[in-house]
Amino acid sequence: IWYVAPKGEKKIVDSGLKFANGLCCSPDQTLLYVADSRSHWLYSYQIQADGSLAHKQKYFHLHVPDTADDSGADGVRTDRDGRVWVATRLGLQVCDQPGRVNCIIPTPNGKVSNLTFGGEHFDTLFCTCGDRVYSRKVKVKGANGWQAPIKPGQPRL
């Protein structure tokens, strides 16, 4: 994982993952989530003021097909309620703040490669799968890194 400073300086902040792929920030922009495509894990890091990362931990255990050795995790996004949405071999896995996969949304034609929230109110989910792009209106709104940080509500257990 590379950190690129506003003036262009670059430094490696973690080289310990098998294959770092999708990444995004939490809605309040205090955590970085990184999908390791060649494992069953999505990691979280606390973002420090200088851009370094601290307190790496395995945050979500991603489910995989019985025939797969890894999750194939790719795109990662968060919604404004703090859930993390991960594109995987099984479909979209939606994870809650305490670190549990709440649901897996299967796709009609295989592995999901990426996803994003769009539309006027960021309440349309778009995902790519094979040679298709799917869209669906959802009851949540996506969080975006270019907007002001959003403090999600307390997680429910």
Predicted regions and their residues:
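Structural signal for beta-propeller blades
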Residues: I1, H40-L42, L92-Q93, V133-S135
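Blade-edge beta-strand/turn elements of extracellular beta-propeller
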Residues: W2-F19, Q46-A68, V94-T107
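Short loop/turn segments that connect beta-strands within the blades of beta-propeller domains
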Residues: P6, D28, R38, R80-D81, ...
